[in-house]
Amino acid sequence: MSAQAAAATAAALQFKGRMITVTLLRLLSPSLEAVGRELDARLADGSGLLAGLPTVLDLEALGESAAGLELAALAATLRAHGVSLIGLRELPGEAGEALRTRAEAAGLAVLNVDGSRAAPRREVEVSPRPAAEPVRSLLVTQPVRSGQQVYARGGDLILTAPVSAGAEVMADGNIHVYAPLRGRAMAGVLGDSGARIFCQRLDCELVAVAGHYRLSEQISDAERAGPVQVRLEGESLVIEAL
């Protein structure tokens, strides 16, 4: 077979199932001018933005005023400030239906809470569910190396080996690391504000609980020393010694 023929028969696409980390950005003002000013300020002091990470916009706090947003202009403003906007978080009821139509016209996906694309609503018959099986914790005994991702769906994640820089560990519940923790660690990824992260040493690039995060440069040397736990207190992450 010639090289030209081989190229013609080779697959041009490959679909792979993989989770990615998504930042949820809550919009608190419908004013594009106000949004632009705050983004300028946050870029100037280097805080608040994770440049390059996929971002989903949450409009729930705007209430009825979300209906009047110019989505295309808003998306352009965010992208001009380095926010990699991929879509909007789904809103309930009629507001959500109207938002979906306008979002798709602006080239934005509408995503539900767990990050998958929202399906059109339809009436369904609800039948009793069987009793759910107990969720088991995920135990990982091998090092999690750079570029690898481990996700404990529906439960806690327990690691007995180091998590390297560039790696990512996630759990719907708590994360326990009986070794140095580097890379990124995210507990309560579906919104469990009671989730916690426990580790022998905190050297991570990012640590988050229920979507509230702190970057490496926002963690003091004192908070890195020795075994610690990370928990959410109100809207802030607390890192304290064990």
Swiss-Prot record:
Stated name of the protein: Probable septum site-determining protein MinC
Domain of life where this protein originates: Bacteria
Keyword presence, Cell cycle: yes
HAMAP family attached to this UniProt entry: MinC (MF_00267)
SUPFAM superfamilies, sorted: Cell-division inhibitor MinC, C-terminal domain
Organism: Thioalkalivibrio sulfidiphilus (strain HL-EbGR7)
Keyword check for Cell cycle: yes
Disulfide bonds: none
A GO biological-process term: division septum assembly
Lineage: Bacteria, Pseudomonadati, Pseudomonadota, Gammaproteobacteria, Chromatiales
Role noted for this protein: Cell division inhibitor that blocks the formation of polar Z ring septums. Rapidly oscillates between the poles of the cell to destabilize FtsZ filaments that have formed before they mature into polar Z rings. Prevents FtsZ polymerization.
Family membership noted in the UniProt record: Belongs to the MinC family.
Subunit structure: Interacts with MinD and FtsZ.
A Pfam family per the record: MinC_C
NCBIfam families cross-referenced by the UniProt entry: minC
Record InterPro entries: CAP/MinC_C, MinC, MinC_C_sf, MinC_N, Septum_form_inhib_MinC_C
Record keywords: Cell cycle, Cell division, Septation
